[in-house]
Amino acid sequence: MKRLLAFSVAALCLPALMLAQPSDGSKQVEYQFTTVKANPITSVKNQFRSGTCWCFSSLGFLESEAIRLNNIKDTTLYPDFSEMFVVSHSYQDRAEKYVRLDGKLNFGAGSECNDVLYVAKHYGLVPQGVMPGLNYGTELPVHGELDALAAAYVKVITSNPNRVLSTAWKKGFQGIMDAYLGECPTEFTYNGVKYTPESYRDSYKINPDDYVSLTSYTHHPFYEKFALEISDNWRWEQDWNVPIDEFMAALDNALENGFTVAWGTDVSEKGFTRDGLGILYKEQVKKTSGSDQERWVGKSEEKNDEPQAPEEEVADQEYRQKGYD
């Protein structure tokens, strides 16, 4: 069976012009982009005030895969998978693991792409309209209360006040998920067809076992699998470790041949902006103090009326490893 790549980006396709927007009234830095390859993608969804970016982005990848696998040309027929169906199953599995490990596991909103593939494989998928996951009075996800309540619940369970776990604790946690996100359906009718989550997934020819996950680090041998040591990889799923040049070549090859990709990254770095830019600054630019404009272009002794783009870092294998370590 042909194995596909899962490391996530929807398409190598960007607008022709994007602007670095300083907040001090100075001129914008303009970046010109050229579309090299545009593969079919679904619309960008709003995770709003939830920590479930991993689910929104990875389901976007699976939606693009459904388009490709079924050769869907009509955009009105593009799938829209329910994020909160995946989130509910993920949280419930994480709660069980957290309790098994006596609380020695990260219990938060974060996760990664392999989690979505796991849920799709073991529980299936459902349409957004069947489980919108908004049972708490807002039109967009707001998970502060849900996350705090879920974390408090599992902490109480692991404190073991009864000296033995009750038979009710899993149902109690599921009740929290059901109250906020809605019950995960085991059967539903959509567009006149009756499905289970598994049969709905299969109707789009999605097989989670067809995908492989790649990473690139030097603290493990290349061409072997290992579980990346980050707190969000709470399922301890394993990735194939390859040299960074091969990692990027695999990405380029996938995109060029019509495949979309799931790319996991940390968007808390300063180089990410709200208007859609991601720039890996040179270290001295990161440390530049002063105005927002100075952080973008670096402070110069000579005034320049034209804003200058910040110097970018070249991320080689050593640089990547240093950032991880």
Each language-model region and where it sits:
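Bacterial N-terminal signal peptides
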Residues: 7-16
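Boundary at the C-terminal end of the N-terminal hydrophobic targeting segment
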Residues: 16-22
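Catalytic-core signature of thiol
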Residues: 22-303, 307-325
